[in-house]
């Protein structure tokens, strides 16, 4: 399915100030790219947060007392009910910005990577086991490169 045929209902919530953030159009493009081979219609929320909210959510849901770049909260519909609701992504602007600096990556490219990475988690991909990590990283690389950015796992 082409990106233009896909219907995305993207709710963007910005709960942080003072950061260079991607536009709604950029976020939608990245979501469509991540989902293009799997869904024709999707609803999701991207919430962009500060360090405190990210750390609190990471502690509550993952038991890690530190902020993180992206958290994924997939929606699971009850059996027999089909909804296009994919779930929620929570992205910490400060962590994304610092990682881009530390990894010597363009900020927009790193934002694209985090959105694609989070969407793949919403689709059920994971990187806990090595085999899963290789599969997920390979797919992420293909998707990110299709957007015109370089391999996010290549050393800069």
Curated annotation (Swiss-Prot):
Its cofactor is Zn(2+). Belongs to the endoribonuclease YbeY family. The keyword Glycoprotein does not apply. GO terms for molecular function: metalloendopeptidase activity; RNA endonuclease activity; zinc ion binding. The keyword Nuclease applies. It is found in: Cytoplasm. Single strand-specific metallo-endoribonuclease involved in late-stage 70S ribosome quality control and in maturation of the 3' terminus of the 16S rRNA. Zn(2+) binds at residues 117, 121, 127. It comes from the Bacteria. This is Endoribonuclease YbeY. Its EC number is 3.1.-.-. Keywords: Cytoplasm, Endonuclease, Hydrolase, Metal-binding, Nuclease, Ribosome biogenesis, rRNA processing, Zinc. Binds 1 zinc ion. One of its GO terms (cellular component) is cytoplasm. Pfam families: YbeY (PF02130). SUPFAM superfamilies: Metalloproteases ('zincins'), catalytic domain. Its main location: cytoplasm. GO terms for biological process: rRNA processing.
